[in-house]
């Protein structure tokens, strides 16, 4: 799940029913921020042809019963939590029964028009389906930043915008110009932006990967760290945002520098660190394997550490580990958590998140607080 559908007001998950018809599983009432919730399913299947009117029914129920007495509780997730998923579902189904006959959904021609904009490019059926891995640095990048493609001879490339010590998700004008040129040359002129603050070239021939990597590497855009400890998501924080309580970027940079050694990163394995500078959770710290929240403690910047979050199919909300830390202290705490994980894991293949779920928070608390 690349869209964290269970952590939004309305989440739509495409799937097919028993008859093979395409539709959505509907989640409602998720969210992060001040009061995080995982959205429950309110309908297992709604056909694509009817999902707009169903979403309209959701919004009408919220408009009718949602809180207006408290700005912090004026959210769908609060209503679902207060009246319960079953009652909210009943209200939506009742409302939708009135709306569905009104033909509010888009006509089939509109869906076809939109679908045409996402038509697959002109793939070359003769593209070789192998990668020359003789260059060791290139091979490491392939192992970590390349994903399988459904078309033989092609690959999906993630361009990491997380060079060690850099600002997460940041790219210079020159780098963006280069990426645009490379997309035109190697990926049918298309660039996709991910929620993890990286870029994707979705349709690259395997026999052109080395040439692409060479160009990216020369521009410091070939860091092989996708989903590793230095692939950190961070909001702009106090450096740029008037809402923030603490800085996020320097913390991300310090953590990345602490774990700069690639062999160490690869040994740690998949680890998602997410940093928010305030309770609004723009950095998705609730969904981080390790989440960091910046708070104001009597005029001083402080950082709260949470563990065990996930925004994937196995959605979970990270739980606060204990008292907060200074900027330097939180980097030390993260390192202690990671070293505790390395000693606790059953084998190098056991991910941080799986180890945390197996042993719970206590061993990590002991490692951090003594």
Sequence positions of predicted segments:
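Peripheral terminal and linker regions in Fe-S/redox and tRNA-modifying enzymes
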Residues: 1-370
